[in-house]
């Protein structure tokens, strides 16, 4: 079953898992244990739609009217594609801000959604920022809950947590660079959470802009049927507006900030292009929508309402993305995107959200009802330290949340009072008395973790929702405060871990060092800098360390006995079975005949397996891709205990692992480098020098882009080397790609270094 096709509440969970098989990633990423479902889970939007229609029949007219005016959307893209600039225009045109400020503007104010000092200094988005605004269309007022997300891969958890709670998204693509590495990553994240999207091709005013090449890349690289619903009027510096090819209307942005839209006839020189792209749009829709397909086969041209209805059906059904174009920086083409959000992205009651009813002790999938009269269910998806304490962002899926009311934390069972309820506008907040189903809000003073579920205080159903996907850290470094006062240092570490699940902290008893791990060098650099600015703690950091993995390449059997006698009752446990290599996550299973190992001891065996995964036998790094199966064993009537079998499993794991031709895996990164054409030889030479494998080279009018795979171990200091060989004009992005077996020489060096540390 494709993970991306699961209903929203269960989308990252795996159905029909045997209770004797443990996948380590489930325990790591989600709060609850393995789920087991007997119900058939919808695999397509058509199947979901049947359930959605049944739910909507139970909603009141007030609920339906409220939902129809609401859109929960995110803005996502590759770094430097113009997300925050686009969002700034959205806020200005919807009246939420009175003036436009640029991301790297000279006024030292910065974009509204980049409220952190570090974001404004570096010109990048580090944290997702939420706001809400209103937009008028066809004499109706619509409310948008909008989240601007980072484009840098190091802050990917911000994209994950935003997409987890949003109903739709605007995917921003650069008209010059087209689909880039992080565009592919964002597309994968949108599929993971079943998020429909409209696409905005930005930077149409730049030299080399080619929107139709970008659309072709969306079709080929993202494997998403896409077609333009606009064509540009003019190109590059001569960009004047866009033509809506559905209605055959030209739209010009006028006024000092492009705030006025003037509709006019299609320019004569664009008439043929408009008809060509309109025919292509209808042809593409015929491939994904039955109604248009029938008209197409009968030779009939669909009407404008039929085309718009088909685009909406196909977009919400995740079969198609309509493509708009313009330039946010030049204030052109942004307002039509807001119209497209209303026309083509779903309202809350058009998305199937599900949870797990755990009231009876047996987990059962339940559909959430976007009604304000139903019992409250909400998901805490983001935490921030505010001036009034911890700020918790909550998406309300069912019922309503009132100021002064109580709700229950599903994980701890604690009753929590909602003392203050706010709507966020970046770092500003506006108090509200209540929020209804489908809305996003924030509250203070709640002790919880990101991804926790809350329900109404008097709710009969105990409903839990799945958390967001949390990727593994790929880089680590040692850290210690310069001063001996560890109070603020510990406080910062605890807070950052709570806010960001990809930021990990552990104490290494061997080196007696605190180790922080994250998604990349920039990720960790930002936290070190934040400790200095927000807590006054200057830190000393060690050299970045790669997060290797240990794996096996051959199957083997094991027969291990743990025996310990020290007077009185001792310890005894014997386990037998086999260990085999496995693609992907680790797995533990057992099949014991005749009760040779009691159930409670088998549970201890699974715990012993989990313990063993944390520190592999070769160099003490996590283990990946191992299946351990226990099929026999032996107990002692007096000396056997859970500890005995946990220890026996740990010993058997080590014994078998070392006999199974173990190897060390290193993280391989997908690298994308862009630079002026005259530096192509230097960049290719640099990548070859690092032992990278070049996958693709795309030559543009002025710039080229190289995509390659390189070992993370060789990438430290790459930014300095790239600046040197491109005179500071080169840019690059890094994204984790896969784990691959490292060179034998490096493996020997790593093992020798680990053994040397062990002897100290």
From Swiss-Prot:
Signal peptide: none annotated. CDD domains: EF-G, EFG_III, EFG_mtEFG1_IV, mtEFG1_II_like. One of its GO terms (cellular component) is mitochondrion. It is found in: Mitochondrion. InterPro entries: EFG_II, EFG_III, EFG_III/V, EFG_IV, EFG_V-like, EFTu-like_2, P-loop_NTPase, Ribosomal_Su5_D2-typ_SF. Residues 1-37 form a transit peptide. Pathway: Protein biosynthesis; polypeptide chain elongation. Residues 68-349 form the tr-type G domain. It holds the Pfam family EFG_C. Keywords: Elongation factor, GTP-binding, Mitochondrion, Nucleotide-binding, Protein biosynthesis, Transit peptide. GTP binds at residues 77-84, 148-152, 202-205. GO terms for biological process: mitochondrial translational elongation. GO terms for molecular function: GTP binding; GTPase activity; translation elongation factor activity. HAMAP family: EF_G_EF_2_B. Belongs to the TRAFAC class translation factor GTPase superfamily. Classic translation factor GTPase family. EF-G/EF-2 subfamily. Mitochondrial GTPase that catalyzes the GTP-dependent ribosomal translocation step during translation elongation. During this step, the ribosome changes from the pre-translocational (PRE) to the post-translocational (POST) state as the newly formed A-site-bound peptidyl-tRNA and P-site-bound deacylated tRNA move to the P and E sites, respectively. Catalyzes the coordinated movement of the two tRNA molecules, the mRNA and conformational changes in the ribosome. This is Elongation factor G, mitochondrial. It comes from Meyerozyma guilliermondii (strain ATCC 6260 / CBS 566 / DSM 6381 / JCM 1539 / NBRC 10279 / NRRL Y-324).
């Amino acid at each position: 079953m494709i993970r991306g096709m699961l209903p929203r509440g269960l989308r990252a969970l795996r159905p029909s898992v045997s209770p004797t098989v443990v996948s380590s990633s489930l325990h790591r990423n989600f709060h609850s244990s393995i789920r087991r479902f007997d119900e058939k889970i919808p695999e397509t939007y058509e199947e979901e739609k049947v359930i959605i229609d049944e739910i909507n029949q139970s909603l009141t007219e007030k609920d339906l009217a409220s939902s129809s005016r609401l859109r929960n959307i995110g803005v996502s893209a590759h770094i430097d594609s113009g997300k925050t600039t686009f969002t700034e225009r959205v806020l200005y045109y919807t009246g939420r801000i009175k003036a436009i400020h640029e991301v790297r503007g000279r006024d030292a104010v910065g974009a509204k959604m980049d409220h952190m000092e570090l974001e404004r200094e570096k010109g990048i988005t580090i944290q997702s920022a939420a706001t809400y605004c209103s937009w008028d269309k066809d004499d109706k007022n619509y409310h948008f809950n909008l989240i601007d997300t980072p484009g840098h891969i190091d802050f990917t958890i911000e994209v994950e947590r935003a997409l987890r709670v949003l109903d739709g998204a605007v995917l921003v693509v650069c008209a010059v660079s087209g689909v880039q590495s992080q565009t592919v990553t964002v597309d994968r994240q949108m599929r993971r959470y079943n998020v429909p999207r409209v696409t905005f091709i930005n930077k149409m005013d730049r030299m080399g802009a080619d929107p139709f090449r970008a659309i072709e890349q969306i079709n080929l690289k993202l494997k998403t049927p896409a077609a333009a619903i606009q064509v540009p009027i003019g190109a590059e510096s001569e960009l004047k507006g866009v033509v809506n090819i559905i209605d055959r209307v030209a739209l010009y942005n006028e006024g000092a900030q492009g705030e006025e839209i003037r509709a006019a006839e299609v320019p004569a020189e664009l008439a043929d292009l408009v008809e060509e792209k309109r025919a292509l749009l209808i042809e593409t829709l015929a491939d994904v929508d039955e109604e248009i397909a029938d008209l197409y086969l009968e030779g009939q041209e669909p009407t404008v309402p039929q085309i718009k209805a088909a685009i909406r059906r196909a977009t919400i059904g995740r079969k198609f993305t309509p493509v708009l174009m313009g330039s946010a920086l030049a204030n052109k083409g942004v307002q039509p995107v807001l119209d497209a959000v209303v026309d083509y992205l779903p309202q809350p009651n058009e998305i199937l959200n599900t949870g797990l009813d755990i009231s009876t002790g047996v987990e059962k999938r339940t559909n959430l009802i976007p009604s304000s009269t139903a019992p409250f269910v909400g998901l805490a998806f983001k935490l921030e330290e505010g001036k009034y304490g911890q700020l918790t962002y909550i998406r309300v899926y069912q019922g309503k949340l009132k100021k002064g009311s109580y709700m229950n934390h599903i994980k701890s069972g604690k009753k929590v009072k909602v003392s203050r309820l706010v709507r966020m506008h970046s770092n500003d907040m506006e108090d509200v008395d209540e929020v209804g189903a489908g809305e996003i809000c924030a509250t203070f003073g709640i002790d919880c973790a990101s991804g926790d579920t809350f329900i109404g205080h008097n709710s009969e159903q105990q409903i839990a929702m799945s958390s967001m996907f949390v990727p593994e850290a790929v880089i680590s470094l040692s850290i210690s405060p310069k001063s001996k006062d560890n109070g603020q240092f510990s406080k910062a570490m605890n807070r950052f871990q709570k806010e960001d699940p990809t930021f990990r902290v552990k104490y290494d008893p061997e080196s007696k060092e605190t180790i922080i791990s994250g998604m990349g060098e920039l990720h960790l650099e930002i936290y070190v800098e934040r400790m200095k600015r927000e807590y006054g703690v200057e830190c000393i950091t060690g050299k970045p360390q790669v997060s290797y993995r240990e794996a096996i390449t051959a199957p083997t059997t094991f027969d291990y006995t743990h025996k310990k006698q020290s007077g009185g009752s001792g310890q005894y446990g014997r386990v037998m079975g086999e260990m085999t290599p496995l693609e992907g996550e680790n797995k533990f299973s057992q099949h014991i005949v005749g009760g040779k190992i009691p159930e409670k001891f088998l549970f201890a065996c699974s715990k012993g397996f989990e313990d063993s995964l944390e520190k592999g036998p070769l160099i003490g790094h996590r283990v990946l891709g191992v299946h351990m199966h226990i099929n026999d064993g032996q107990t002692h009537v007096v000396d056997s205990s859970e500890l005995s079998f946990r220890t026996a499993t740990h010993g058997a794991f080590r014994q078998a692992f070392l006999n199974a031709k173990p190897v060390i895996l290193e993280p391989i990164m997908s690298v994308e480098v862009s630079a002026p054409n005259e530096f192509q030889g230097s960049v290719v030479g640099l990548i070859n020098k690092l032992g990278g494998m070049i996958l693709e080279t795309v030559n543009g009018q002025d710039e080229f882009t190289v995509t390659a795979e390189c070992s993370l171990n060789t990438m430290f200091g790459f930014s300095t080397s790239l600046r040197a060989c491109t005179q500071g004009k080169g840019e690059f992005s890094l994204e984790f790609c896969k784990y691959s077996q490292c060179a034998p020489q490096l493996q020997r060096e790593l093992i020798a270094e680990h053994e040397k540390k062990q002897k100290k």
